[in-house]
């Protein structure tokens, strides 16, 4: 038995470096696909974004830092929440397959005319980044984000993507998911959120550590009203049921 293992090891060592690298990459690729398949059925106990927040706190010697994260099935979340998230972050979510090329084209056009480069990430891309990857901007992370997004869209129904997004999105410093945010900031459960509550939560998503749900400034109040109007124009929660 040992000789057989040793013989295979010797064969592997004689392979050229590029072949060994290819095998390693294939194994990593298969493992990443397996991750996606597992979370199609298993609710994630943590996301990589949460892990990163812990590391950030510990690097600042905040040893008592604790996340606020409470998983909540989509059936236990008020219908006003998913449509508010879609209205705020990705209005073509039911229509695309993970990448909104129209939004990407508009963002690049806006940037070419001298404007700042606006984000065009879909909800699916945000789930891929928040669940599996690290924060920050780099071509490597963006490439991996695209890889995970492809498999997420292939294996998960849209309903599952929204469910995980609603549970791992950050709504305040260390506050993840609509249930934790609703309890902490609005003293409600996610099932009891009305349209105004849901829009207020969704309004802080671009910069959850910058804006305060409990004490919203003029921008958040304006954005919350805008999200409510957009959700209504999309057709409310029926917009998600139709696709």
From Swiss-Prot:
Subcellular location(s) of the protein: Cell inner membrane
Topological relation to the membrane, as annotated: Single-pass membrane protein
Transmembrane segments: 22-42
EC category name: transferase
GO biological-process terms attached to the record: cell wall organization; intracellular signal transduction; lipid metabolic process; peptidoglycan biosynthetic process; regulation of cell shape
Keyword Protein transport carried by entry: no
UniProt-listed Enzyme Commission number(s): 2.4.99.28
Known catalytic reactions: [GlcNAc-(1->4)-Mur2Ac(oyl-L-Ala-gamma-D-Glu-L-Lys-D-Ala-D-Ala)](n)-di-trans,octa-cis-undecaprenyl diphosphate + beta-D-GlcNAc-(1->4)-Mur2Ac(oyl-L-Ala-gamma-D-Glu-L-Lys-D-Ala-D-Ala)-di-trans,octa-cis-undecaprenyl diphosphate = [GlcNAc-(1->4)-Mur2Ac(oyl-L-Ala-gamma-D-Glu-L-Lys-D-Ala-D-Ala)](n+1)-di-trans,octa-cis-undecaprenyl diphosphate + di-trans,octa-cis-undecaprenyl diphosphate + H(+)
UniProt-listed Pfam families: Transgly
Pathway(s) this gene product operates in, as recorded in its UniProt entry: Cell wall biogenesis; peptidoglycan biosynthesis
CC annotations in GO: peptidoglycan-based cell wall; plasma membrane
An example Gene Ontology molecular-function term: peptidoglycan glycosyltransferase activity
Keyword annotations: Cell inner membrane, Cell membrane, Cell shape, Cell wall biogenesis/degradation, Glycosyltransferase, Membrane, Peptidoglycan synthesis, Transferase, Transmembrane, Transmembrane helix
Function: Peptidoglycan polymerase that catalyzes glycan chain elongation from lipid-linked precursors.
Stated family: Belongs to the glycosyltransferase 51 family.
Protein name, entry field: Biosynthetic peptidoglycan transglycosylase
Organism: Xylella fastidiosa (strain 9a5c)
Gene this protein is translated from: mtgA
């Amino acid at each position: 038995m040992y000789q057989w293992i040793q013989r295979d090891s010797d064969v592997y060592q004689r392979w050229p470096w590029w072949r060994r690298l290819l095998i390693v990459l294939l194994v990593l690729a298969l493992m990443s696909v397996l991750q996606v398949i597992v979370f199609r059925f298993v609710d994630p106990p943590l996301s990589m974004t949460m892990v990163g927040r812990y590391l950030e706190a510990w690097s600042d010697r905040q040893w008592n830092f604790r996340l606020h994260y409470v998983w909540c099935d989509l059936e236990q979340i008020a219908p006003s929440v998913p449509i508010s998230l879609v209205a705020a972050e990705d209005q073509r979510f039911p229509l695309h397959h993970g990448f909104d090329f129209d939004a990407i084209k508009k963002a690049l056009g806006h940037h070419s005319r001298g404007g700042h480069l606006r984000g065009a990430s879909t909800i699916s891309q945000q789930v891929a980044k928040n669940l599996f990857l690290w924060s920050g901007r780099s071509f490597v992370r963006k490439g991996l984000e695209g890889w995970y997004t492809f498999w997420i869209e292939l294996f998960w129904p849209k309903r599952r993507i929204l469910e995980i997004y609603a549970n791992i999105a950050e709504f305040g410093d260390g506050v993840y998911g609509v249930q934790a945010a609703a309890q902490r900031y609005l003293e409600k459960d996610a099932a009891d959120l009305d349209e105004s509550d849901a829009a207020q939560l969704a309004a802080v998503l671009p910069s959850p550590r910058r804006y305060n749900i409990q004490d919203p400034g003029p921008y958040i109040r304006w954005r919350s009203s805008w999200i409510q109007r957009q959700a209504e124009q999309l057709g409310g929660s029926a917009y998600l049921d139709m696709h």
